[in-house]
């Protein structure tokens, strides 16, 4: 095993001698040694020896050492199924443990960084690379027109920017940001204005669902806690450390042995409410406690540099969720499921508040003998006595000299009553008026009532010269989470609404032809007419199909949610695959029928949010927004929002990438943001872009800091909304320090991108060049994916897409509508499949051809220009950096093995030609990325990431060969079963499928993403 893991090679991940680096090295050594001991004890030394032999397939750099032929491949092919499964499980377990150690290291590193920020502040660049938005100091450029642009910059400027930009990307903290703003002479009034409107919303989704079982997640958390305890021991007295360390090592070994004996695969397909509980875990265990720390860190950093400025409101960072509300392609998200989700969320947050108030009762033991209270607190106690006499009888004597404890006893009882009432509402069939009602004052109808009581206590403490951090933290949490924890977005695909209206209008006989046959202009006219009348269109009793009835009932359920939980819980309806303005008007018509849209005024408590996903829809998005803003009721409609005159627009990274490739997708999204912002400003409206980013690069994933800074100037303005995919929640929010770091990084990037900008965004000729590159890249990508008749068969045979669809990891089907076409396949399994085979094709294919064709026009000048882009333009640098990172994870040798071994004999020649085409594009892309970046090897600019990728690649190589072997056996078994041939395998299909799925789990853990 040690030859696979190479535990003696201590410089593989990081060369720094920091405490965090030493901790990483020590922890890697420890867990690898423990894992070897566990495997030997549980499965014998033979398994350890087998893993060492398999490790010889990969080089130290993490790629296949040589063509996979000869004795080693014979070993894999000759493995008994049980041996192959044990090997796959061992690699899977190794990756998951390494992930824990890396997260632990990241947390340790973040602590070190926070402690050293005072030194780091003096390390900021002396030369600014960007300026104040709209006011001053944009980075000067030498290009004034297209001719100048193509002439290229000087080598000196290239070098200086190459040195400077990585320094800026190293940081992402408040303590670094505010001194930098001061150094750049950003006017404090601009900073204050931005802080006043700072609005960051992170939306958790269930898809792609985390591939790891919740049971395994629990074990991972226990391992992480043991590593934390080891850290504490290292700071203890030496005579205590050895004995305790041995005890912890024994506990670690015991935990991993239990883990080894636990099934890794999901035993059943999760239901939607299972996904809800999984997501809520991160709020309960981490996020709830981290939010006050985030606010305190911002406030402290701000006041150290700008003591006169006021920090933003507590609600500057909020959360949303699609889990339980996203219906797009998921038939299991019913109205009652969404209702139960809202109750689950409220129950969680109320339980946390109850715990906090109980702690405050113990803490605030102030006596009237030693402190004064204000009359308003005494008045409130008299009112409490009338409303909750039982509490007065119980505590009046005990707390007669302790007014804060008495007040909090009343608060606690109201919270408990509110929680009990919420539990009674959890069954959807029980409406609010049917639930047990309490008298006013005995429970809280909304979070603002609870907050008012906390503020009363805080004000009394401050007036008497006291403060209570735990109370301040609770107030912060209430302002951020309220009683609903996170806002619930509803999402549905656009054709569902059109088909429902088609059935409704046909039943009523009010249109001359089916609704779906109307032109866009005819649809718009009819929808506007219906929106202007109070006459209901839909009868109270629903005589329609189940699908249409469910659409109608969803809107009625939203109305009930708003009545019970408040409009803040659920006020956005996202329309996926939006094409025209009629897609939005259809949703507003259903909202009107449910009482959410007022036809007399145009006011609405539900906003229709278009989601533009394909390249064609992104190009058409400005026209759709123009039509929406031109509607006669639009000003009243937007003016009724919680943020007046703000329209939200969602841009999809996944389907646009699947549709046109990585470069074209990113450029179309970039352009769409610029155009939509200009349109909103021309109508006098505000715009919030909702970024539908996935976890993988092929779906818009990657470092959030660089991605936010790469957005066009003037499109953020302190306001952003981003999805946090189910698969990345563990890597970002499983540990408090990681969660705090992630939230601080996002907030820092939003402030920085709003106040500082690169003037390159305004150079039109540079956009023309990007348009050329995007067009060429798209043509190359689509030629392979959509214009090669054998490609869909190639994809189905050489990737594990068939087997991925059988993983029990998601409540949602892998395809829209169940059709087996490339267009119906969701972007998540599309990316997942290419990741498993090490092609990672969606994140880079077509980029090399686009760069090559551009460089061929004027080689020297255009190369200089592309390097200039890379050094100066955050957008272009982000694109190239993501491509570089993805290329480093590609392994064409293992990919070739998938093609050779999994292709049907009649397809092998054609599929090998496709492989050669992909391999040629890979080599071309790698060569040109290295030329532009100036690196000798991929990721030379980030040695720590380079070593991490190499470490993972090395162990993924043998796991990939195991996967191919198991897939081949499984498919041969399926083929023999289908043809009626005599089965030659000694194993059943279930055992073979289990082995294949275990390798999928392992590679996903190694690559750290599914889709």
Swiss-Prot record:
EC number: 4.1.1.31
MF GO annotations: magnesium ion binding; phosphoenolpyruvate carboxylase activity
Summary of the function given for this chain in its UniProt record: Forms oxaloacetate, a four-carbon dicarboxylic acid source for the tricarboxylic acid cycle.
UniProt-annotated catalytic positions: 207, 658
Enzymatic reactions: oxaloacetate + phosphate = phosphoenolpyruvate + hydrogencarbonate
UniProt protein name: Phosphoenolpyruvate carboxylase
Protein keywords: Carbon dioxide fixation, Lyase, Magnesium
Cofactor(s) required, per the database record: Mg(2+)
PANTHER family membership: PHOSPHOENOLPYRUVATE CARBOXYLASE
Gene: ppc
GO cellular component terms listed in the entry, alphabetical order: cytosol
Signal peptide coordinates: none
Keyword Lyase: yes
Alphabetical GO biological process terms: carbon fixation; oxaloacetate metabolic process; tricarboxylic acid cycle
Family indicated by similarity: Belongs to the PEPCase type 1 family.
């Amino acid at each position: 095993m040690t030859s696979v893991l190479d535990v003696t090679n201590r410089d593989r991940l990081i060369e720094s001698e920091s405490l965090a680096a030493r901790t990483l090295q020590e922890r890697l050594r420890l867990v690898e040694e423990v894992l070897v001991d566990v495997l030997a004890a549980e499965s014998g030394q033979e398994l350890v020896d087998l893993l060492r032999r398999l490790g010889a397939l990969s080089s130290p750099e993490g790629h296949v050492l040589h063509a996979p032929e000869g004795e080693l491949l014979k070993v894999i092919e000759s493995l008994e199924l049980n041996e192959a499964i044990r090997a796959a499980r061992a690699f899977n377990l190794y990756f998951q443990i390494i992930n824990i150690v890396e997260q632990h290291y990241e947390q340790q590193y973040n602590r070190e960084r926070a402690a050293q920020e005072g030194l780091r502040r003096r390390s900021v660049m002396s030369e600014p690379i960007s300026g104040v938005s709209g006011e001053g100091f944009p980075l000067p450029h030498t290009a004034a027109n297209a001719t100048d642009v193509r002439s290229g910059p000087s080598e000196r400027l290239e070098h200086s920017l190459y040195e400077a930009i990585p320094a800026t990307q190293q940081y992402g903290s408040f303590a670094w940001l505010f001194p930098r703003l001061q150094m750049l002479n950003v006017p404090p009034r601009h900073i204050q204005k931005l802080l006043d409107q700072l609005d960051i919303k992170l939306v958790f989704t269930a898809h792609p669902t985390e591939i790891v079982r919740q049971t395994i997640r629990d074990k991972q958390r226990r391992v992480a806690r043991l590593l934390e305890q080891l850290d504490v021991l290292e700071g203890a007295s030496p005579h205590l450390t050895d004995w305790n360390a041995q005890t912890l090592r024994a506990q670690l070994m015991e935990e991993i042995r239990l883990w080894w004996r636990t099934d890794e695969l999901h035993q059943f397909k999760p239901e939607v409410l299972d996904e809800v509980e999984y997501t809520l875990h991160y709020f309960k265990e981490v996020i709830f406690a981290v939010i006050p720390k985030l606010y305190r860190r911002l406030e402290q950093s701000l006041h150290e540099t700008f003591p006169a400025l006021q920090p933003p409101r507590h609600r500057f960072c909020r959360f949303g969720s699609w889990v339980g509300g996203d219906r797009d392609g998921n038939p299991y998200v019913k109205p009652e499921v969404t209702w139960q989700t809202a109750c689950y969320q409220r129950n969680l947050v109320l339980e946390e508040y109850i715990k906090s108030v109980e702690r405050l009762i113990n803490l605030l033991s102030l006596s009237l003998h030693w402190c004064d209270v204000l009359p308003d607190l005494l008045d409130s106690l008299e009112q409490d006595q009338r409303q909750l006499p039982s509490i007065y009888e119980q505590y009046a004597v005990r707390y007669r000299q302790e007014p804060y404890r008495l007040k909090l006893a009343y608060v606690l009882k109201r919270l408990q009553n509110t929680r009990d009432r919420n539990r009674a509402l959890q069954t959807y069939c029980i409406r609010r008026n049917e639930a047990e009602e309490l008298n006013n004052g005995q429970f809280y109808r909304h979070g603002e009532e609870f907050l008012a009581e906390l503020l009363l206590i805080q004000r009394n403490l401050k007036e008497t010269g006291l403060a209570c951090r735990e109370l301040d933290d609770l107030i912060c949490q209430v302002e951020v989470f309220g009683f609903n924890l996170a806002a619930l977005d509803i999402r549905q695909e656009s054709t569902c609404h059109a088909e429902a209206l088609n059935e409704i209008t046909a039943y009523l006989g009010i249109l001359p032809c089916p609704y779906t046959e109307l032109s866009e202009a005819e649809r718009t006219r009819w929808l506007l007419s219906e929106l202007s009348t109070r006459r209901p269109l839909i009868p109270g009793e629903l005589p329609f199909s189940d699908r249409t009835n469910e659409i109608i009932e969803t809107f009625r359920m939203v109305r009930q949610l708003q009545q019970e939980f408040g409009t803040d819980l659920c006020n956005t309806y996202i329309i996926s695959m939006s094409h025209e303005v009629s897609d939005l008007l259809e949703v507003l018509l259903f909202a009107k029928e449910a009482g959410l849209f007022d036809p007399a005024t145009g006011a609405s408590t539900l906003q229709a949010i278009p989601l533009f996903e394909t390249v064609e829809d992104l190009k058409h998005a400005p026209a759709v927004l123009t039509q929406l803003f031109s509607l006669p009721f639009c000003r009243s409609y937007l003016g009724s929002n919680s943020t007046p005159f703000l329209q939200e627009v969602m841009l999809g990274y996944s389907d646009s990438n699947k549709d046109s490739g990585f470069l074209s997708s990113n450029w179309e999204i970039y352009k769409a943001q610029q155009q939509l912002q200009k349109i909103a400003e021309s109508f006098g409206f505000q715009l919030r872009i909702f970024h539908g980013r996935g976890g993988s690069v092929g779906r818009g994933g990657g470092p959030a800091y660089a991605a936010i800074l790469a957005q066009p100037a003037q499109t953020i303005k302190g306001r952003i909304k981003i999805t946090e995919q189910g698969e990345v929640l563990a890597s970002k929010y499983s540990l408090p320090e990681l969660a705090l770091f992630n939230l601080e990084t996002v907030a820092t990037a939003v402030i920085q991108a709003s106040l500082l900008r690169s003037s390159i965004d305004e150079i039109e000729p540079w956009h023309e060049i990007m348009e050329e590159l995007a067009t060429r890249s798209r043509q190359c990508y689509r030629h392979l994916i959509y214009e090669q008749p054998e490609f869909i068969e190639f994809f189905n045979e050489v990737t594990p897409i068939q087997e991925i669809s059988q993983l029990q990891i998601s409540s949602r089907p892998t395809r829209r509508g169940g059709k087996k076409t490339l267009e119906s396949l969701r972007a998540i399994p599309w990316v997942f499949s290419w990741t498993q085979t090490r092609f990672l094709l969606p994140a880079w294919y077509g980029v090399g051809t686009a760069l090559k064709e551009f460089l061929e026009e004027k080689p020297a000048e255009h190369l200089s220009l592309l390097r200039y882009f890379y050094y100066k333009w955050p957008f272009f640098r982000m694109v190239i950096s993501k491509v570089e990172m993805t290329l480093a994870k590609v392994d064409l040798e293992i990919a070739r093995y998938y093609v050779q071994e999994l292709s049907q004999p009649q397809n092998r020649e054609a599929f090998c030609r496709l492989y050669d085409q992909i391999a040629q594009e890979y080599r071309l892309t790698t060569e040109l990325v290295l030329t532009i970046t100036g690196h000798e090897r991929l990721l030379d600019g980030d040695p720590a990431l380079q070593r991490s990728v190499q470490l993972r690649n090395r162990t993924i190589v043998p796991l990939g060969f195991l996967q191919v072997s198991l897939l081949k056996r499984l498919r041969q078994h399926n083929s023999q079963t289908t043809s009626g041939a005599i089965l030659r395998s000694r194993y059943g299909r279930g055992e073979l499928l289990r082995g294949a799925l275990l390798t999928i789990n392992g590679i996903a853990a190694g690559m750290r993403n599914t889709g």
